[in-house]
Amino acid sequence: MEKKKVVLAYSGGLDTSVAIKWLQEKNYDIIALCLDLGEGKDLAFVKEKALSVGAIKSYMIDVQEEFANEYALMAMQAHTLYEGKYPLVSALSRPLIAKKLVEIAEQEGATAVAHGCTGKGNDQVRFEVSIQALNPYLEVIAPVREWKWSREEEIAYAKENDVPIPINLDSPFSIDQNLWGRSNECGILEDPWAAPPEDAYEMTLALEDTPNKPEFVEIGFEAGVPTTLNGTAYPLSELIKTLNAFAGKHGVGRIDHVENRLVGIKSREVYECPAAMTLITAHKELEDLTLVKEVAHFKPMIEQKITELIYNGLWFSPLKQALHAFLQETQKNVTGMVRVKLFKGHAIVEGRKSEYSLYDEKLATYTAQDEFNHDAAVGFISLFGLPTKVYSQVNQKKVEA
């Protein structure tokens, strides 16, 4: 019987390495796909490992700039913080991985794609809904969800089939990382009362180890896009990397979060997002300077919905596309400079300026340079308060009667 082709999202870890052998037993030829999202892995090694385990072909694609410009940028402009805390580190990368899986599957004539997600996480939903949106005719295989092995059984299978066991297998943590940040769960972190050990962190310093003097960064934006750091222009992916180092050194972006997963359970995760939290903070302050009141007050409602859609795996949904169009319209005048102080875990905005600033000092000042028409306030208050006044008059008459 002729073998079918499957494209596997391959990380180089135990689960997806074992999945190659498992899929071979199901009569598939496996094409491994590894994406460089800025996580810092030795991806050339990962690519070769897939071939050594049994893949017939192995792709390694650098998608850092695409991830930064088409995914992280939207998240920053929408100030996406799930449940007010989590900047959607993993949730942002899943639709891009799904997109590349579909592209390679179509290019290679594969009938299926596969991922290494378990049956109790959010990522299985994000991958499969995204794949269905992009190509509803592809079969989606989830080996880890299907085989239901314990960790010990999986290791035994790997040894029986000469699958290399990762040297970090004894680590209790499950880690996912990209340009936008790093997520960490499992091990002692599963106890919400336990303090995260310092070895749970990699991108940020503990507060007691951070510098005792603040560092200042000036972030330049053009139409809502971060373009410069301290006067130096960077591609967005490089700007994020550079800011991760600046802000991480000062302990910015550590997040300890018990979140409500899409699949109905609560999970405790630790995140490190130094650049993401700094950029979201700075961008919001520049919007406060450049957006009219009505847009500034309405936009958070759209932001919350965008955040939910991304978290829930609906990146390619019609509603998300429509809300993205609104978001892009709001960014036209979000151009300027924001000065941020990085110190002891905080990113504090200390200055902002823009050629599109709607702040008029002559109207805001209480000095002799004040140009605000104080006399206009009397008529404004009378008209603004008229409905309340009439309501009160009518109801007081009824009480008196």
Curated annotation (Swiss-Prot):
It is found in: Cytoplasm. L-aspartate binds at T118, N122, D123. The keyword Lipoprotein does not apply. One of its GO terms (molecular function) is argininosuccinate synthase activity. It catalyses: L-citrulline + L-aspartate + ATP = 2-(N(omega)-L-arginino)succinate + AMP + diphosphate + H(+). Keywords: Amino-acid biosynthesis, Arginine biosynthesis, ATP-binding, Cytoplasm, Ligase, Nucleotide-binding. ATP binds at A9, Y10, S11, G12, G13, L14, D15, T16, S17, G116. L-citrulline binds at Y86, N122, R126, S174, S183, E259, Y271. Pathway: Amino-acid biosynthesis; L-arginine biosynthesis; L-arginine from L-ornithine and carbamoyl phosphate: step 2/3. InterPro entries: Arginosuc_syn_C, Arginosuc_syn_N, Arginosuc_synth, Arginosuc_synth_CS, Arginosuc_synth_type_1_subfam, AS_cat/multimer_dom_body, Rossmann-like_a/b/a_fold. GO terms for cellular component: cytoplasm. Its EC number is 6.3.4.5. Pfam families: Arginosuc_syn_C, Arginosuc_synth. Its main location: cytoplasm. One of its GO terms (biological process) is urea cycle. Belongs to the argininosuccinate synthase family. Type 1 subfamily. Homotetramer. This is Argininosuccinate synthase.
